[in-house]
């Protein structure tokens, strides 16, 4: 009995130590923080990333490359193909609402493959601390092909780097709950699906974007200029819109716009020569 008590005590101590060592999210702690000023600039995806900045490249559909100053490469909604450039990402994230958001056969050379789902209905919890970047997720529900609901089947991934809080809403099928908003914390930059049908209706997506109050909103999951233009036509006067034809931008805390800005990026696969 004494041995059993000692064993339990050791487990509790180890759990407490793990909780103490787990890096806290500054995006939650600073959810009421004030964003920076100035603006952001275009760049090639292969350019060195400026100090205290993150490069964002729109690859395709819901897939983005995030690159840090130290050369850490993360690809969202990874399908197994990013382009002709021989890139092995350090991290890929995936959601499984449709095959255009994941692959069952990621390259085994990728060090970290983060699936946005777990056992059916159970969800999954990610908290990957890579030093330069902390990656975590907030689970939401998705509809399945049979008209039912898979609880916690989608992940909103949050990437914390260079003092920024960058969110990818994934295949969002419902307005987040107050608890989910609280778990997200502050999002300076957010990638949001704007198709208006397969994911959230536009009215609900605009509600979500209004609640998040992100400085930079990057539309994704638009299937044509028609669906993109339909979304842009619904944007209220509180948003600025930038559409300069670029696929890549670099953003930092000091370069966030003073007004909420829809920044349209044009999807382009990664090429070795750009």
Please report, for each region that a protein language model flagged, where it lies by residue.
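A Lys-centered signature of the CheY-like receiver
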Residues: 220
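Short, flexible, glycine/charge-rich loop motifs used to bind or transfer phosphoryl groups or to couple energy/partner
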Residues: 64, 80-84, 156, 179-181, ...
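Metallo-beta-lactamase
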Residues: 17-143, 164-169, 188-192, 225, ...
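Bacterial N-terminal signal peptides
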Residues: 5-15
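Residue-level signal for inorganic ion chemistry
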Residues: 217
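Active-site-proximal loop/helix segments of hydrolase catalytic cores
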Residues: 142-212, 223-229
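Short beta-strand element of the conserved SAM-dependent methyltransferase core
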Residues: 6, 66, 157-159, 265
